[in-house]
Curated annotation (Swiss-Prot):
Organism whose genome encodes this protein: Bifidobacterium longum (strain NCC 2705)
One GO process term, biological-process aspect: negative regulation of DNA-templated transcription
Annotated spans, Disordered: 300-334
PANTHER family the record matches: HEAT-INDUCIBLE TRANSCRIPTION REPRESSOR HRCA (PTHR34824:SF1)
The entry's keywords: Repressor, Stress response, Transcription, Transcription regulation
Protein's name according to its UniProt entry: Heat-inducible transcription repressor HrcA
Family: Belongs to the HrcA family.
HAMAP family: HrcA (MF_00081)
Length: 372
């Protein structure tokens, strides 16, 4: 019973510190929470929690504040992600439903998430490595150069220059393009590269073998290039309101390292809990600039049958945890939505907002409204 009560005290300390950002004392806990014990008992519990590394006392006469370990315990035991209110859901749908393209939807999502959370929002464009080929067009632009225009199932349009020894006839290039589109439709870029090499080696394509091999190299390069993902960021101005001004410079440096940030949040979005949201706190990220920050991330992508968009309410909340898990498992993440803020962020609210925006983008992709 003592350990169970002690953890209730820890939860109360974390909740109060998130709300006030001031050290929490036993008197306020006794007054504001129904813990069923005296202030003296709570003081003893807080001292024990400090010994166990969940709390620290910044000053001798002050109350306690959570440590990274304390926040982790709190986050891991959040029973559910708090659903958004009906008004919040309507607001998200209203703002994001005006998107006219994938890029517009991603930019709007970053701005909206930042406004909801009061933190930095980061939204990545769909990964080329996880996208499938919809169409490729090859256009001669110089004596020995072709421009390959690649369109994926997520609406991404990528361009890649192809340098070749000599330019084949336009009819032969078009015939190769048609064959590639027929055989590679719906394949990943890496699988498309393998298929194009097979086409290059087959009879009848000798005149465009160099073009085909170069196109296969381009597919492989695009599939492996993490920098090909665009990162949409909003809300860095919110950092100016941080009380920990000394932490701002390294945090801004971390936000500039987009490849590192992309890898961190992409990995986190794939290591999610049952609600489909991942949380990393402080040193867990192994990134010096984020030592005093927390990151909340969720993947978005294609929906399977059980995770299809919820009609006119793509951010409608599942009614049960099993529904949430079903929707999470039926969505193949191809990019992420994330929020970066202080370790004393409102985790429950941030997780709800991140999940809602991720679900909207999943619906957006599933409905095919991705043309730029």
């Amino acid at each position: 019973m003592t350990q169970s009560r002690r953890m209730l005290v820890l939860r109360a300390v974390v909740e109060d510190y998130i709300r006030s950002q001031e050290p929490v004392g036993s008197t306020s806990l006794t007054r504001d929470h129904d813990l069923g014990v005296s202030s003296a008992t709570i003081r003893n519990d807080m001292a024990a929690l400090e010994d166990e590394g969940y709390l620290i006392q910044p000053h001798t006469s002050a109350g306690r504040v959570p440590t990274e370990k304390g926040y982790r315990y709190f986050v891991d035991r959040l029973a559910t992600v708090v659903p958004l209110s009906e008004a919040q859901r309507r607001g998200i749908n209203s703002f994001l439903s005006g998107s006219v393209s994938l890029k517009d939807a991603l930019q709007r999502s970053a701005r909206l998430l930042s406004e909801i959370t009061g933190q930095v929002a980061v939204v990545a464009s769909p990964s080329l490595a996880k996208a499938t080929l919809r169409h490729v067009e090859m256009v001669p632009v110089a004596m020995t150069t072709l421009l390959a225009v690649v369109i994926t199932d997520t609406g991404r349009v990528a361009q890649h220059g192809l340098t070749i020894a000599s330019m084949p006839a336009v009819d032969e290039i078009n015939r190769l393009s048609n064959t590639v589109n027929e055989q590679c439709d719906g394949l990943s870029l890496s699988k498309s590269a393998e298929t194009v090499r097979s086409i290059a080696a087959s009879a009848g394509y000798e005149s465009v073998r160099g073009v085909a091999d170069t196109l296969a190299d381009a597919f492989e390069s695009m599939a492996l290039d993490e920098r090909a993902n665009e990162l949409y960021m909003s809300g860095t101005s919110h950092l100016a309101h941080s009380r920990s001004l000394a932490d701002l410079a390294p945090l801004f440096d971390a936000l500039e390292e987009q490849v590192v940030l992309m890898k961190l949040m992409s990995n986190l979005s794939e290591e999610t809990n049952a609600s489909g949201v991942g949380v990393a706190i402080g040193s867990e990220m192994h990134t010096p600039g984020l030592l005093h920050a927390s990151v909340v991330s969720s993947g978005y992508g294609r929906s399977g049958a059980a995770g299809e968009p919820a009609g006119n309410d793509p951010v409608g909340e599942p009614e049960t945890e099993s529904e949430t898990e079903s929707q999470t498992n039926d969505t193949e993440p191809i990019a992420f939505v994330g929020s970066i803020g202080p370790t004393h962020m409102d985790y429950a609210a941030t997780m709800a907002a991140v999940r809602a925006v991720a679900r909207y983008l999943t619906a957006f992709l599933s409905e095919g409204r991705t043309q730029d």
